Design a protein with these regions (language model features):
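A ligand-binding cleft/hinge motif common to bilobed small-molecule-binding domains
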Residues: 116, 130-143, 224-244
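Short loop->beta-strand "edge-of-pocket" segments that line small-molecule binding or catalytic clefts
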Residues: 60-77, 172-190, 223
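Extended ligand-binding regions for polar small-molecule ligands
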Residues: 83-93, 165-168, 181, 256-300, ...
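A conserved helix-loop-strand patch within extracytoplasmic ligand-binding domains
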Residues: 145-195
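An extracytoplasmic/periplasmic, membrane-proximal ligand-sensing/linker region
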Residues: 283-360
Length: 360
């Protein structure tokens, strides 16, 4: 009896190979992920994939790596100037670090409270924030440790305003502080500007950050002044609320003011790294290059129309005390000249070399 015939060998089809390849690839990726997950933050540092940095990731950082978790503010993302500057500063510092934004936005009050605890993670600081970028003020300087180098060279004290287009006609007639005092201005709760506006005799309404553009869209305020370095990042948020929210083209409100990086008083390593790296970035020109590329953009130049604005300078005696440690060569805005009344029009600012990127 002859043996049974051997069945023909089945030739694998393309679809079989594809499915098998996908299964093998998926298995390899899974094994690789499990293997590298404990070193995720270290790998993040090496490949410069700097996005959000969560409390869990901070807890997994190698010993000796400084966690640099910047509090996310209104409209901020990983393309914003503050986080890009902080990346540059930390790179220049030479300190081992991992950096990112908090996973979600924090009000300034909540962020300052968390930073002041000195705890990274846990119920008192669930987003593990280690550094904030805020307008300088005596109370803030008491609660936290300031790195006294202006984040935008003092441009935070140059304010343009978001408004409803129905309010533009009224703003056109504003020429001085007395005119400005007849308006209702808007600011966020806990912001350092509130006390200064009160002392200047201005009428100001404060609200949590999530309500700011809603109040503008509902025409419950006349003007929401913001630093010229911040408005481009905020435009998308403004437009989501209402197409009727526009930038006022008439006024530039100025007062001696600056934003600093702030850390907990006991965070010596991070404070020293930020100050060292910031000074190096100023000295080698990379800070000015970043400022012109990210802040002084063609969009801002067009929307700001600086040469056509009327300048209203406000006193800020309390704020000036918080700025006493700033070295003169770290300022971009000439506050002494502005404060004594020598400059009262935007076109005069355009004559200064450091402002020419914002002017025709």
């Amino acid at each position: 009896m002859s043996p049974p015939p051997t069945p023909p060998r089945r030739t694998p089809h393309f679809g079989d190979l594809t499915v098998m390849s996908l299964l093998i690839s998926s298995l390899v990726l899974l094994v690789a992920y499990i293997a590298i997950r404990p070193r995720f933050s270290h790998g993040r540092l090496l490949v410069d994939q700097l996005h959000d940095l969560t409390a869990e990731e901070v807890s997994l950082l190698p010993e000796g790596t400084i966690p640099v978790v910047l509090g996310r503010g209104l409209g901020e993302n990983n393309r914003g100037f503050k986080i890009q500057l902080l990346r540059l500063v930390m790179q220049r510092s030479g300190a081992p670090h991992a950096i990112g934004l908090t996973a979600s936005a924090l009000s300034q009050d909540a962020a300052v409270d968390a930073l002041a605890t000195g705890v990274v993670g846990g119920t008192d600081n669930p987003q593990a924030i280690t550094v904030g970028a805020y307008g300088a003020g005596p109370e803030l300087n008491r609660r936290l440790r300031a790195i006294p180098i202006p984040i935008t060279g003092g441009m935070l004290g140059l304010r343009v305003g978001w408004t409803h287009h129905n309010r533009l006609a009224g703003l056109e007639g504003v020429h001085d502080r007395e005119d400005l005092s007849r308006l209702t201005l808007l600011q966020g709760q806990g912001w350092s500007e509130l006390e200064m506006f009160d002392q200047a005799g201005l009428r100001t309404f404060a609200t949590p950050s999530q309500n700011l553009f809603r109040l503008v869209s509902e025409q419950r305020v006349d003007l929401f002044p913001q630093g010229v370095a911040d408005v481009q990042a905020q435009e998308a948020i403004a437009q989501k609320w209402s197409k009727s929210i526009v930038m006022d083209p008439h006024l530039l409100i100025a007062y001696p003011f600056a934003g600093f990086f702030y850390v907990n008083h006991r965070n010596e390593a991070l404070a020293a790294a930020i100050e060292r790296g910031f000074r190096r970035a100023i000295e080698d020109g990379s800070y000015q290059e970043l400022l012109e590329r990210v802040v002084m953009t063609p969009w801002l130049k067009e929307q700001l129309n600086l040469s056509q604005r009327r300048l209203i300078v406000l006193p800020n005696p309390e704020g000036a005390k918080a700025l006493e440690q700033v070295q003169s060569n770290h300022w971009i805005v000439p506050w002494e000249t502005l404060s004594d009344g020598q400059i009262n029009r935007g076109e005069q600012l355009c004559a200064l070399p450091r402002f020419q990127a914002l002017c025709p």
